[in-house]
A protein has these predicted regions:
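A glycine-anchored, Pro-Gly-centered beta-turn/N-cap motif
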Residues: 70-74, 84-87
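C-terminal tail/sorting-segment detector
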Residues: 12, 81-112
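Glycine-centered coil/turn sites that cap beta-strands in beta-rich domains
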Residues: 9-28, 32-52, 75-78, 93-99
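Residue-level signal for well-ordered, solvent-exposed loop/turn and beta-edge residues enriched
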Residues: 56-59, 73, 99-100
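Solvent-exposed serine/threonine-rich low-complexity stretches and specific carbohydrate-binding patches
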Residues: 60-69
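Surface beta-loop-beta hairpin patches that serve as ligand-binding interfaces in beta-rich domains
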Residues: 1-6
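Residue-level recognition of secondary-structure-to-loop junctions
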Residues: 42, 68, 80-83
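Short, glycine-anchored, charge-dense loop/turn motifs used at functional sites
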Residues: 27, 52-60, 88
Length: 112
């Protein structure tokens, strides 16, 4: 009927369809002047790509490109002195065998 829910519960199998791979934190400081820190926790071993793009999607800095990382906490410092002020995005792409890739981005603002 109209307005009634279609799914009563999520099965344990459905919960495994999207693995908990990482936690991507907001860069600090944000907004920033010249340098900012990008941090993430990796909850299980994965192949990662981590990069910074401008507002049009062009990659400005690639920290890693399909490299294998062990679980743990990671920090990357990005120096933007050679770039224009504006909005940038940092993106992590994680792949674990048996799952589709997971892509997550956050926005940061560079001010001079």
């Amino acid at each position: 009927t109209f307005g009634s829910k279609n799914i009563d519960k999520i099965s344990a199998m459905d919960a495994d369809l999207i693995p908990e791979l990482f936690v991507l934190y907001q860069n600090y400081p944000n907004p920033f002047n010249s340098t900012t820190r990008i941090s993430f926790d990796l909850l299980q071993d994965a192949t990662l790509s981590l990069y910074v793009t401008d507002a049009t999607g062009r990659i400005k800095t690639a920290f890693s490109d399909k490299e294998l990382y062990n679980s743990g906490k990671y920090n990357f410092d990005w120096n933007a002195e050679s770039f224009s002020t504006g909005v940038y995005f940092f993106t992590i792409n994680a792949e674990v065998e048996g799952y589709l890739p997971i892509l997550f981005s956050r926005k940061m603002i560079y001010l001079k």
